[in-house]
Amino acid sequence: MFRVLNKVFDNNQRDVQRIIKTVVDPVNALEQETMQIEDLAAAFLDLRRRVQEGGESLDDVLVPAFALIREAGRRSIGKRHYDVQLIGGAALHQGRIAEMRTGEGKTLVATLALSLNALEGRGCHLVTVNDYLARVGMEEMGLLYRTLGLTVGLASREMQPHEKQAAYACDITYVTNSELGFDYLRDNMAQSREALAMRAEHPLNYAIVDEVDSILIDEARTPLIISGAAEKATDLYYVYAKLIRRLQKGEPAEPGVRAEPTGDYTIDEKGKQVHITEAGISKIERLLSIPDLYSPENMDKAHMITQAIRAKELYHREKDYIINADGEVIIIDEFTGRSMPGRRYGEGLHQAIEAKENVKIENENQTLATITYQNFFRLYNKFAGMTGTAKTEEKEFLDIYGSDVLVIPTNRTILRKDSEDLVYRTKMGKYAAVVQEVAEMHATGRPVLIGTASIVTSEQLSDLLTQAGIRHSVLNAKFEAQEASIVAQAGRSGTVTIATNMAGRGTDIMLGGNAEFILGESIEQHLGISRFAPEAENFIKAISRQDPAAEMLGMQIPGMTPEFIQQAQQLQADTVADRARVQELGGLHIIGTERHESRRIDNQLRGRAGRQGDPGSSRFYVSFEDDLMRLFANDRVVAMMDRLGMDDSQPIEAKMVTGAIEKAQARVEDRNFSTRKQLLEFDNVMSKQRDTIYAQRREVLLGPDEDVEESTEGMIADFVDMQLAIHAPADQSPDAWDIEGLQAAIVDAVPQLEGFDFESLRHGSPAQAQDRLLSAVADAFDSRREELGSTMLNSLARYVLLQVVDQHWKEHLHGMDVLRQGIGLRGYGQRDPFTEYKFEATNMFNEMIDNLKSDVTKFIFRMQFGQTG
């Protein structure tokens, strides 16, 4: 095992050394020369010409480009890229996942790869997990890009279409992962070129995904869906929510314990599934007065009852979702603890939860467009990722995305001390110990950050801390509006912060607090200008440096007063003094209140302490009542506590326990990886179909009139061939052909052929019959062109193709949803569900294409042009 670990370490070290030799050293050698260049934008434009006109590759110009970008950072925003940041920039350019510790400056690192790849003129995207980080990143780095002559934009949810178009037309665009994915889907539903948000050419060229593990692994199972209301009654969910209260939860069958399951249903917490027993089926059939719950006409009932039980037993308020002020069920992201407005559980589960909570049930939605992040980001010509924790998931990044992970060295040595876990028998014993440790730390003035896995836990601990007289702040899905402000000050002395799943929070915790953040907020609140306005930015930086010029720079801001400047200077002085005090006390102390299913989430929490060489420490408190331990850990550890006669207040601190926890986490990670891989296998079937439809649709939307006309004629010819294959197959004698059926099908679609002599097709070979019929239909198309004029016909064809494709694709997605939901039952019939799914999905797609061609033919020949508008 150690050999394998050493090999991994050696490979990483070898790659780092190679980048130092080929990138870092040459860039450093150019630094003095680059500092003499007056016009950095002109020099960068010259590199752009070399790439776009001179045939040089991005690798050819990487060294001079990085030198210019570093100098632009130094001049414009006062930040010079460290050598380790150059390593990170090179890794991102290579399309790798760069693992960088918290506080190592990922935002600045990204400017290297983004600016370099922008030289191609095809657009680059910096993808973040929320709007706040996208806006801050764009505004913080905007001046650097503009110094190089590059344009930078922000694409956000509330923008008008023309604003989005301008943002995506920039060299570099900052955008959230969800908005980017939805823009892609919306563009593939657009009815005109003018309605496109993203670039018409090269919309997905290069992207850097921040918090890449959160987006591409944690959110991989959640597809992006654009939906419309489907006409379906929802009141039955209330009926079934009441009905299942009359059912009894039982225990599953277990070898050596019970041969048969008990009760009316059993639950599988690990797989988040429920199983209705034979007794339960009989009871439900009796309550509903139906003979067979699983007969075809009752499948909807069986599905809704199953979802009602899942909603009752497996999805819990304040942990999996919250109810907002408007009575809406809002999902909580299990990995980040963030609320996700607009997201809904699929397959009727969301409606079942709404019925359980007795709030208004929203109409079931019909999918209009959908894609998973797994398949979306693989559409890019090249993409890279940044995160503080990726190495543990390298196998998944390699298997699914073809991206390896490079661990970037830290600029300063990490001083954080990570203690062994303390394991308690019960949750209450654990919480009491946490409160005691917080009290001890708080008494010294040392800041403490407590990480919890749910809102329920954060509120329980908050109550306990309040009872102990310890002032604190709470950060969870209910208080996201104050998120950045709370996190920014979590490093001040005496501060105690409870945070639900710190993963992806995106704001650095600075020891002593973040004076720049507070000052920026004050400027926006009291002076009414953005903290990123040049005059405000210069003032904030001068205050941060305790520069005597701060007073002069401050007075250039409209509305500024001497009193405000004095308060800002005092704030900075207090922050500097507090930072020194906190460092002396040992830095930020992290307390984890339970181990997460993923080691990455635990590592992200630990990583909040010890940034940029600061001191810090961490410890996790675990109990055998925690979900991870209860479901996955080894029973031997519990037995050992029993033998030792340990009470609730006595912890174990042993490597055996830590090992058991890590094995449990590894098992869960493997299971989740298998689930995501299986999801990808199923989604790949849909992905190929989506790629085909979207590519054809894009050709219709953006192609010249002659191409649209050619596509239309091709579809009409295919329709004719299809009818011939059905009614007059070439391997049959013409005497056996169903000429009446052929005539009915063709004339229904092409009424202009009503006078055509179909019976005469029997005289001659099948090929001659095909030629005659295709020629007659082509003549009808020419007549249609003469009737409407070429311009009008092409407008009609474009409109018809888009409308028909969209309608059939929507219906196909619904059919695929139904197929996917029911395919698991095939396993009971000894058939492989995936093979069955792939076979049936392909047949459904081919049938859709045939129906699509049929409808296009009918609309082209029957529709009046005036009806299109």
UniProtKB/Swiss-Prot annotation:
Pfam families named among the record's database cross-references: P-loop_SecA (PF21090), SecA_DEAD (PF07517), SecA_PP_bind (PF01043), SecA_SW (PF07516)
GO MF term list: ATP binding; protein-exporting ATPase activity
Give me the residues that bind ATP, please. Answer: Q85, G103, E104, G105, K106, T107, D508
Under catalytic activity, the entry for this protein gives: ATP + H2O + cellular proteinSide 1 = ADP + phosphate + cellular proteinSide 2
- Record SUPFAM superfamilies: Helical scaffold and wing domains of SecA, P-loop containing nucleoside triphosphate hydrolases, Pre-protein crosslinking domain of SecA
Task: Indicate the transmembrane segments per the record.
Answer: none
What domain of life?
A: Bacteria
Gene Ontology biological process terms, A to Z:
intracellular protein transmembrane transport; protein import; protein targeting; protein transport by the Sec complex
Per UniProt, subunit arrangement is: Monomer and homodimer. Part of the essential Sec protein translocation apparatus which comprises SecA, SecYEG and auxiliary proteins SecDF. Other proteins may also be involved.
What does the protein in this record do? Part of the Sec protein translocase complex. Interacts with the SecYEG preprotein conducting channel. Has a central role in coupling the hydrolysis of ATP to the transfer of proteins into and across the cell membrane, serving as an ATP-driven molecular motor driving the stepwise translocation of polypeptide chains across the membrane.
State the protein's name. Answer: Protein translocase subunit SecA
